[in-house]
């Protein structure tokens, strides 16, 4: 079954919601974005987090080192043979000291009882131009 325009809108909004929840400190609501057993893989920062509760705890542990703004852009969605959706997007993090960083998010998005959720996210730091 092809993903619909409504699905595309819902998934894009889901991806955007992550930044809003993090920036407002509403980490207990991350279950609205991720499955309870999400794998959040951040190899460039040396860790893999499993579970939405552990993800919220990791965010709290970062404390003041968290960005003040998570900005997601350039969302591209493609349906997979198993009905899941692969979502690729760019993230820009703005820190309190005015510096910024760029990442690529590679997400597996699955349909669950209450809508779409991210079941796997790989976050890759972008530190060199032209894919280097």
What role is predicted for each listed range?
Residues 1-24, 28, 32, 36:
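Short, low-complexity N-terminal intrinsically disordered segments enriched in polar/charged residues
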Residues 26-29, 41, 119, 123-126:
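Poly-acidic low-complexity segments
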